[in-house]
Amino acid sequence: MSRDITKDIYGDLNYAPITLFGNKLNVGIIGAGRGALIKTRNFYNKGSNIEVLALEFLDDFYELDTNRVKLIKGCYKTQFIKNKHIIIIAVSESELINKIKLDCENHHKIYINSAKFNEGMGVIPVSRESKYISAAINTKVGNPRGAVLVANLITEYIFELDEFIKLSGEIRNNLKFEEKTKDSLLKFINSKDFKFFYDKNKIINVLKLFYDDN
């Protein structure tokens, strides 16, 4: 009898998506290997304040702005997590990982376990951005390279939609209708039909249908 072994391996991964403002985050990263560097750069590029704790650092860490990335040489102590919003566990020693996890749970910290992602509280998605759109991609089978593939495939489409999203956002922010008409118009300007008229350069004519004759 066949069965879906992915359920045994990954369990039921029920993501609860939330988008945080990177420049308001204090992030603690424990470990300074290649994986830690990748995650440091990810938060660095989003403007986060970062502290990295390790006994040794890759040379690449020293290329980052020291005003935003503080490198701390030393062993882990509970005090390290107390002023952080998110903790990245990027070490391989099981005993240390369990100690950090317990501290994070006791202090209500969001933590990511790089060694075994499903034993943490979440994962860092693959993100792609245009000027007006931000997208984050996860897989539900622990396949980060697969997430990169999907993100790359949709990137071109994101850029194609960029100016359309800008326009629909500007219209939304300048609507002066009563609530019922406004709601109806908002549904329309964020529909495939409206995108069709946008592509045909007929937006002005269509929008006039929502105004009085004057």
Annotated model-derived regions:
Residues 15-44, 52, 167-182, 190-193:
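Glycine-rich adenosine-cofactor-binding loop
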Residues 47-51, 84-94, 133-142:
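Short beta-strand and adjoining strand-loop segment in the mid-core
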Residues 3-22, 125:
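A short, basic/flexible loop-to-alpha-helix module at the beginning of a structural domain
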Residues 74-78:
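Conserved SAM/SAH-binding loop
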Residues 86-91, 97-123:
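ADP-ribose/adenylate-binding Rossmann-like module
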Residues 108, 112-162:
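E1/E1-like adenylate-forming module used to activate ubiquitin-like modifiers
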Residues 139-214:
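An accessory alpha-helical subdomain
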Residues 38, 46-63:
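NAD(P)-binding Rossmann-fold cofactor-contacting core
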